[in-house]
Amino acid sequence: ERNQGNKVHGFCDGFRGLNQNIKEYFDQEHIDDGPGSLLKTSYDYVDIDRAVKNLGDYDRLYCICGNESMKSARDLALDDRVDTNIIGIAKTIFNDMPGLESIGFQTAVQELARYIDSAYIEASSTNSIVFLEVPGRHNSGLTTHAGLARNSKITNVITPSTRGDYRTSIEYSYGNRGYAVVVISEMCEYDYLITSLSVKAKVITPGYLIGAVDPCTYDSILAERMVREAFNHAQEHRDFIKGATNIMPFKDYLRIV
């Protein structure tokens, strides 16, 4: 945008900033390739009436969102009162936006792989059972991909779709190897499982710290490419979401979310 001579402003705290018209001017000195968000985030839903007023004569609004926040961007894009071109950029560690690969997922998988390495060292060195709880309240994609990334170091992967007797499987792994590393989705209730095991289990819960790390090279390149492609597409099209490999109009996002 700046290369085209356009001024760039950022609304702070997600859609809360748009609702309250909290914004700041962006220049090159603001740009940082590290983790986190320069503008910060919130879980506030967009207030369409206030957003229409605060958008004013902005040409384009880039909404860097996960699945829930993208619904606010969608509602903005589909409101007839909004003249601004609404452009969604898929970004979430959970990769749970149907039909769209998002920025951040590969970084989260890579960070989880490091936690699995640590869990493996702890379990195998102390002949113990270690649970690693993977975040994701509505999607277990992180759990399954982390399992694939460190398959040789994991004895059990448990998601809501896992069938069978968890306890028996874990006990078998422990008896066979002398240790067990269990990667389990946050969506699973497992307190009963821990108390029913023959040995006391240890639990590692990295939580959302996995998203507060430097982006991996893949995500850094992906982010740069996605925003450039989104900008180019926005010159002739409006109201769409840019994923890693495709573009989805907001009107289609309405039908599947």
Predicted region positions:
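N-terminal phosphate-binding or glycine-rich loops at protein starts, especially the Walker A/P-loop
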Residues: E1-R16
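Accessory alpha-helical/coil subdomains and C-terminal extensions
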Residues: V8, C63-G66, K71-D75, D80-D83, ...
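Short, glycine-/Ser/Thr-/acidic-enriched flexible segments
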Residues: R16, D44, G136-R137, C188-E189, ...
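Glycine-rich oxoanion-binding loops at beta->alpha junctions
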Residues: G17-K71, I93, E101-Q110, R114
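Acidic/polar active-site rim loop that often engages polyanionic ligands
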Residues: I89-S102, S124-T126
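C-terminal non-catalytic interaction/assembly regions of soluble proteins
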Residues: Y190-V257
